[in-house]
Amino acid sequence: HIWNGGIKEIDVPDRVSPRVFWAAGKLYALKKAKMPAVMVDLDLIVWKNIEKYIEGTNICAIHREGIYPDVYPGREFFNMKDGYAFDPGWSWDEPPVNTCMLYMADEQFKNYYVDSSINFMENCRETEENLCHMVFAEQRLLAMCAGREGKIISSFFPEAADIEGQDVFTHLWGYKNILKFNFQKRVEFNDRLCERIEREFPEETVIRELNVCR
């Protein structure tokens, strides 16, 4: 397993569409994990110790996001099963949270957030991937749940643009698509990673023996 918490298997119900909710496994894994814990996307590289960022926080994420209508539409956009209702205590004005890296300390709040997200996914009728449903379940609901419970969400970087000029993280995000189809870009990117590993972690002397770094 890849989780330090000892999670060996995740069962995502068939009623949760993998086309729509491709990252649902993260939320089902988070349900099993005990807090405090950090959840990190597989396309995020953490280069520095983050202890000083999360110390004294209850919830800490990379950054908040703007409510862009094409990514974060209103409630009328969502195709939900009969009987599902959005909590009237959720504010649709809360800035969503980028969860490529997320720290949470409170077990009770974690369960409230995850249960709300899972309930949304399991009651969604949508079958075609459109980004909006997944980021609502994972990123916007986190902000809504925190707002309802009076929880403060801290950020590593106040604005999304701030992540460009820092050296704590490398987040591939959409760049994965370029690397997938462009061999030369993959070679250049791997070389940069290997050089940084050699420079900042000289004890990792076997890095150049890996095929990907040759």
Give a label for each model feature.
Residues F21-A23, L42-V46, F77-D87:
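Active-site glycine-rich loop that binds ribose-phosphate moieties when present
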Residues I54-E122:
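Conserved catalytic core of nucleotide-sugar-dependent glycosyltransferases
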Residues E159-R214:
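C-terminal catalytic/acceptor-binding lobe
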Residues I2-K8, G147-S155, R199-E204:
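Structural alpha-beta junctions
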Residues W92-F181:
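Catalytic core and acceptor-binding pocket of nucleotide-sugar-dependent glycosyltransferases
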Residues G25-D70:
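GT-A fold catalytic core of metal-dependent nucleotide-sugar glycosyltransferases
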Residues H1, L42-K48, P158-A160:
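Short, polar loop motifs at secondary-structure junctions
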Residues H1-K32:
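Active-site-proximal specificity loops/subdomain of glycosyltransferases
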